[in-house]
Amino acid sequence: NFALDCVMKYPVGVYLAFHHHLVHAQSALKIHSTELDAFSGINAADPMTHMTHSPCYIVHEDDISKAARFNCLSLMMQPLDLLQQIANLQTICQSPPNFLILQGFGTGNLAVNDQLTACIEKLQHAGCAVILTTQVPFGGIDQRYAISQWTQQANIILSDCLGHADLYAKALKMYLQYDTVDQWQAHWHDHV
């Protein structure tokens, strides 16, 4: 099995293995829905020049069962009426995941009001970390726009990841390494 062979060959890290290609997960991007060469990214044999990872976390036996309970939901925000967005979040509040990833527009923009912020706070109080990222595959969140003030007030985690696979892996690492939303928020931006 290619993926298992790679575990022995490459240093500790997070990778994506697919159809005999191995790329750094931080850079992985799904580029085709049906082709076997479906992912793009920095080859695992090449060094990463943009390192945004936290210190390594060694997975232990008890982490495997904990990982099976990991619940992460990624919500691509659409140009819906704000009241519909709030209704969607209220539905999620009924059975919140551990992590809710909100994919904003462009640089991470998202229409908000007090009701939406209250839904986010309700999710956080229920043990759900809320992360804001962008739907755009390259670039990232840009704090020059109005998103910074409400994200600080709502205590939202801003993604510092290179892609969705990297973001998922980082959320899983936080879940395994720490136990509460407060800890996830406190350690999210810990870098080497």
Predicted regions and their residues:
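Short, hinge-like loop/turn segments at secondary-structure boundaries
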Residues: 1, 32-33, 147-151
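Short, glycine-/small-residue-rich phosphate/pyrophosphate-handling segment
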Residues: 1-29, 184-185
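Short amphipathic alpha-helical segments and helix-helix/interface helices
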Residues: 4, 86-90, 116-121
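Residue-level signal for alpha-helix termini/capping positions
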Residues: 8, 93-94, 124-125
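Accessory alpha-helical/coil subdomains and C-terminal extensions
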Residues: 15, 21-113
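Conserved active-site loop/cleft motifs that coordinate metal ions or position small ligands
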Residues: 16, 102, 130-134
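ATP/nucleoside-binding phosphotransfer catalytic cores, i.e., glycine-rich phosphate-binding loops
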Residues: 114-192
